[in-house]
Amino acid sequence: MALLEFFRPQKKATANIAKERLQIIVAERRNGGPAPSYLPQLKEDILKVISKYVNVSPDMITVSLEQKEEDLSVLELNITLPEDDN
């Protein structure tokens, strides 16, 4: 039994190191570098178009660009629409 306990802490340390490294890699891939300079203007333009049809404020819209692969980016647009008062 003592022999197993001797090796057990090393496995946990190795697993923790691997987990930390993986978290760093995932975080770097999510960020994908700085956001494009056109993103704020795009959000403003989208807000203007949506405001023609629905009463929304700028804080109700989030726009993000995520680099999935080297040649693939995903533009994500989330809009919180107000409840319809019929």
Curated annotation (Swiss-Prot):
Q: Which InterPro entries match?
A: MinE, MinE_sf
Which GO BP terms, alphabetically?
cell division; regulation of division septum assembly
Q: Which keywords label this protein?
A: Cell cycle, Cell division
Q: Which Pfam families does the annotation name? A: MinE
Please give the SUPFAM superfamilies that the UniProt record associates with this protein.
Cell division protein MinE topological specificity domain (SSF55229)
Q: What does this protein do?
A: Prevents the cell division inhibition by proteins MinC and MinD at internal division sites while permitting inhibition at polar sites. This ensures cell division at the proper site by restricting the formation of a division septum at the midpoint of the long axis of the cell.
Indicate the family of this protein. Belongs to the MinE family.
Its protein name is Cell division topological specificity factor
Natural source organism: Aliivibrio salmonicida (strain LFI1238) (Vibrio salmonicida (strain LFI1238))
